[in-house]
């Protein structure tokens, strides 16, 4: 009789422990979601700038595919990766449109377009501005993705180095982040980088940039670089998985 009672007590103890552990495992995902670090990420704004747009097609490959369309496609994919991690993302354009329409008799459209992008970054109070572009060269063998920064902005440089490190993981010839004198990067009030995602003058690279899966890999690398560069006061989560 005593043996039966002891076995029953042990069974009840085991059942209680199993119930408690099961409850903790069930609640763990919900407990994790309320960690303040994610809410801090939600307070971090990144401005993505798909270069060109509308009447400004940018450069193009030999088949006539325009830079503006590639820039926009990759920017949308970067936004998806960052928002998945809780980052607030603003884009200078979400469709094929220019930010400074052509006005007959008035010059300086390009500068007005850049100024409009800068103002959007400032009004959004963005921590980083990441401008996406494609490159072109008279040397058809030139290729590679490069992140540019303003040499007087250490925060922008750190962001460019972080992005470049991730880009080098997916390109055959590693490149170095480089300083550049660009009107967009020299403006005060935000930390900007320009990411050239490849040369449309290079046949192989141009073909890759037309592929959605390759665009996804580029976007993932840039998003990873942005997340790694965030201040240490914010969490650094990663998107769910790297593209195959």
Language-model features, listed with the residues they occupy:
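Catalytic-site microenvironment of enzymes
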Residues: 1-244
């Amino acid at each position: 009789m005593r043996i039966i009672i002891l076995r029953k007590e042990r069974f009840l103890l085991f059942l209680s422990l199993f119930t408690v552990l099961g409850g903790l495992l069930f609640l763990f995902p919900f407990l994790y979601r309320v960690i303040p670090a994610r809410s801090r990420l939600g307070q971090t704004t990144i401005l993505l700038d798909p270069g060109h747009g509308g009447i400004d097609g940018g450069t193009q490959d030999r088949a006539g595919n325009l830079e503006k369309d590639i820039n926009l496609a990759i920017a949308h994919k970067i936004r998806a990766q960052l928002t998945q991690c809780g980052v607030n993302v603003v884009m200078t354009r979400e469709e094929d449109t220019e930010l400074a329409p052509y006005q007959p008799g008035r010059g300086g459209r390009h500068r007005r377009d850049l100024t409009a992008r800068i103002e959007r970054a400032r009004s959004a109070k963005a921590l980083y501005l990441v401008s996406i572009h494609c490159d072109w060269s008279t040397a058809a063998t030139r290729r590679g993705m490069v992140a540019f920064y303003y040499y007087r902005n250490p925060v922008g440089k750190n962001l460019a180095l972080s992005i470049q490190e991730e880009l080098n993981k997916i390109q055959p010839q590693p490149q170095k982040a480089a300083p550049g004198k660009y009107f967009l990067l020299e403006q005060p009030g935000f930390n900007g980088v320009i990411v050239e995602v490849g040369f449309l003058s290079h046949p192989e690279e141009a073909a890759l940039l037309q592929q959605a899966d390759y665009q996804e890999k580029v976007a993932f690398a840039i998003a990873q670089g942005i997340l790694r560069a965030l201040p240490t006061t914010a969490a650094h989560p990663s998107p769910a998985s790297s593209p195959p």
